[in-house]
Amino acid sequence: MIGLAYFLIIWLGVGLLTGIKFIFVDQVYDEEFKELMDKETAAGMERNLASLFFKNKLNVIAFFMLIGLLPLAMRITKLFKRG
C-alpha cells in the first residue's frame, strides 16, 4: 500500500512540474494557444468545454497534474524516434 502512495506522489509531482514548465518555461499558453484550441474543437458542447477548461492557468496545471507522467513519456519516445 505504501508503494501505491509513493507512486501517486511521484505521478502528481511530475504532472505539477510538467504543467508549470508548460505555462511558464515553454510559454505555450497564450492568446494564440487559446484561439488554436477554439478552432480545433468542434462546434457545440466540445467547444464550450475546451474554452471553459483552458480559461485560466490553474485549470491547465490541474490537467497536467492528472495526466502525470504521460507528457514526459511522450517526449522521451519522441527523442528516441528522432535519434
Swiss-Prot record:
The chain crosses the membrane at residues 5-25, 60-80. It is found in: Cell membrane. One of its GO terms (cellular component) is plasma membrane. It is a multi-pass membrane protein. Its main location: membrane. Keywords: Cell membrane, Membrane, Transmembrane, Transmembrane helix. This is SPbeta prophage-derived uncharacterized protein YopE. It comes from Bacillus subtilis (strain 168).
